Amino acid sequence: PGPCNCIETNVCICGTGCSGKCCQCGDACKCASGCGCSGCKVVCRCSGTCACGCDCTGPTNCKCDSGCSCK
């Protein structure tokens, strides 16, 4: 559904064919919009068709596109 922006548990691997944009390993595992990542335990999803920002690392500090909310 949405991008996987999450806290790393082991290693961050963005899904096949996904852009490496926003993808980091360390404190957080972040993949480009529409991509999934493995080795994660916290996922932020924005409502509807909205995308989460690259700095989203979980429900407590989730930032979504204007006019959208996080779950």
Curated annotation (Swiss-Prot):
Binding positions for Cd(2+) 6 per the UniProt entry: 52, 64, 68, 70
- The residues listed in the UniProt record as binding Cd(2+) 4, with positions renumbered to this chain, are 44, 56, 62, 70
Transmembrane portions of the chain: none
Binding-site list for Cd(2+) 3: 25, 29, 31, 40
Residues reported to bind Cd(2+) 2: 18, 23, 37, 40
Q: Which GO terms describe its molecular function?
A: metal ion binding
Q: Which UniProt keywords apply?
A: Cadmium, Metal-binding, Metal-thiolate cluster
Metal-binding is among the record's keywords: yes
What upregulates or represses it?
A: By cadmium.
**Residues bound to Cd(2+) 1:** 14, 18, 31, 35
Q: Which residues bind Cd(2+) 5?
A: 46, 50, 52, 56
* InterPro entries per record: Metalthion_mollusc
Which family would the database say this protein is a member of? Belongs to the metallothionein superfamily. Type 2 family.
Q: What does this protein do?
A: The metallothioneins are involved in the cellular sequestration of toxic metal ions.
Q: State whether it acts alone or in a complex, and with which partners, per the record.
A: Homodimer.
Record-given protein name: Metallothionein 20-III isoform B
